[in-house]
């Protein structure tokens, strides 16, 4: 990955959202790097047959990272060896930012920010045992308090190709007023490797503001992309205009990919995606109530065609989508 000639755009891993069907849709709008939903090392080692599907990728994904979590060195090593057999995976990203209690309270995700020596040791374990060309890490600014300097200095000793920094602590969760781009800039000044800024990037204007403040080598976007996958196209072209895409066709394409990938259960799974796509549209609440009752492919498709019977969004700027606690 050459960070010298352009600012790279990443789709953030979001549990329950950034599966293969969604990544396939987003990839068409110019995102450079896609990442799997977070997969625990334990699941990879002890339930690989069930977990493997989360690590499949579409032919469009030319830079695809498998994101794993874990805190036990031996289990992480075995998980990496499992991924080694997956030739389509281009690299491994290590999650040290997930704030969910069931993850962090067991020393995984953002819980590793309380023991930076162990965090670096795990990153070395990944690098020493992987056959992939790229390894990376995603962190927050700290667990309860901000320690950006300490994290940056520690990661200078870690064998990773780039660092993704979410501009909040674990305690901040997703509070909008807690975002701190200056601390990302501080880490950028210390780290001797590329830094990717993440958090609250919801428009073209915000994207360039964050790049200016942080001097980051790229941006990672999650929630804003759920409703407006084209935000990557807008940033790449520095425009607030929308690409030539009919929203109804995009939603239908995403739905068809869900059914193809998951079978009939893809209908129910797609409800949350429809909630995101409908946010900000007229009658969105009634539409959400309606789709929450639909279980058949035919009726869901008809509902989508009826509701999204308009060529474009009513608003240019993506609205936030609330995520569940599992989301990273």
Model-predicted segments: where are they?
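Flavin-dependent oxidoreductase catalytic cores
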Residues: 1-328
């Amino acid at each position: 990955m050459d960070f010298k000639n352009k600012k790279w755009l990443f789709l953030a891993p979001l549990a329950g959202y950034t599966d293969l069907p969604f990544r396939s849709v987003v990839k068409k709008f110019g995102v450079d790097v896609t990442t799997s939903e977070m997969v625990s090392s334990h699941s990879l080692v002890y339930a690989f047959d069930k977990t493997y599907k989360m690590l499949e990728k579409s032919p469009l994904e030319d830079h695809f990272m498998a994101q794993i979590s874990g805190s036990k060195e031996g289990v992480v090593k075995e998980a990496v060896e499992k991924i080694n057999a997956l030739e389509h995976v281009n690299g491994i990203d290590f999650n040290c930012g997930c704030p969910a209690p069931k993850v962090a309270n067991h020393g995984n995700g953002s819980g590793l920010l309380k023991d930076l020596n162990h965090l670096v040791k795990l990153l070395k374990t990944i690098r020493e045992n992987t056959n992939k060309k790229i390894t990376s890490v995603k962190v927050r600014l700290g667990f309860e308090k901000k320690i950006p300097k300490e994290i940056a200095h520690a990661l200078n000793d870690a064998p990773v190709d780039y660092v993704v920094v979410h501009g909040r602590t674990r305690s901040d969760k997703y509070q909008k007023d807690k975002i701190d781009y200056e601390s990302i800039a501080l880490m950028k000044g210390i780290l001797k490797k590329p830094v990717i800024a993440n958090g609250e990037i919801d428009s073209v204007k915000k994207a360039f503001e964050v790049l200016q403040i942080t001097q980051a080598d790229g941006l990672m976007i999650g929630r804003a992309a759920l409703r407006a996958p084209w935000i990557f196209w807008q940033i790449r072209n520095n425009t607030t205009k929308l690409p030539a895409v009919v929203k109804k066709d995009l939603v239908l394409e995403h739905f068809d990919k869900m059914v193809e990938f998951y079978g009939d259960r893809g209908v129910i799974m797609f409800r949350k995606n429809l909630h995101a796509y409908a946010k900000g549209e007229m009658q969105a609440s009634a539409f959400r109530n309606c789709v929450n009752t639909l279980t058949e492919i035919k009726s869901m498709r008809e509902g989508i065609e009826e509701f999204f019977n308009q060529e474009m969004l009513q608003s240019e700027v993506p609205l936030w989508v609330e995520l569940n606690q599992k989301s990273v």
